[in-house]
Amino acid sequence: MKTLKLQYHKHDIKIGKRCDFVPPTVTESCLLEYDGEVIGFYLTDLPDKLKQYITIANKEFLSKNVPKSLLERSDVYEMQRKLGISRKEAMARNTVQMSTILGAVLAKPHLRRPYNSVSAVHTNEKAKTFIKAMLLSCLECEKLIEKYMPQQYKLQKKLIEETTLPKYRFGNLFTSSISNFNIAAPFHQDRGNLKHTVNAILTKRKDTEGGALCVPDFQHTFEQANNSLLVYPAWFNIHGVTKIIKHNEDGYRNSLIFYPLAGFDK
């Protein structure tokens, strides 16, 4: 597999800015090297076993079996205000966005939950197939990380063992998972993650374009094709998801993400 040597570029993009549609610059499988180190990789095609697992996970995620949180973007509210239409009408004219979290969830005192916990989805019997498929997908991703980034695998496994109680682990390298339906996240940095770790981002999509990961520091946008995997150090710098364009009503772009949060040592 070829190696893409990344270089830092100055820019004026700030956290919170929405990411416009940008054609992808990285469309082939490659290792990502920065400052002499492999910091991630992109695979445009996956091993059959992993493909099978994420197909099952995606099917379940799209079904009513899996509880989801509905996210309402600012443009829904803006459309309501400008056109004087109902929330339902505004949502119908925009792309519905939903997400589901598995694994560990950090304490949220402002929501009267001053303690760490495990996602309530794990108690939902109808979601069991989804949870199993996601965990198996996670373990297969870890095998690929061990294959392409053996030093990172050892480091991250050790970090999780040293900082995360067993009940808060998702696989061996992560604490949590989030599945996103049509979410084009604005520029952000995963500051809550353990430092010196990587996220694993699987993509399932149908009849859409956009929804690529844009990293302004490196002036690159990763395609995130159907059945692809992007392994990236999300704690390291800002990144955002480009605008998702649906070609028909059934179109979607789903990301199935595994990530390692800090703060689960008690």
Task: Give the residues covered by each predicted segment.
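Conserved metal-binding segment of the jelly-roll/cupin
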Residues: 222-238
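A short beta-strand-loop-beta hairpin characteristic of the jelly-roll/cupin
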Residues: 204-225
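A generic "cationic amphipathic patch" detector
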Residues: 215, 240-243
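Structural signal for hydrophobic/aromatic residues that build the beta-strand cores
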Residues: 202, 213, 227-230, 256
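Fe(II)/2-oxoglutarate oxygenase catalytic core
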Residues: 1-200, 205, 221-222, 242-266
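Coil-to-beta-strand transition motifs
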Residues: 197, 206-210, 236
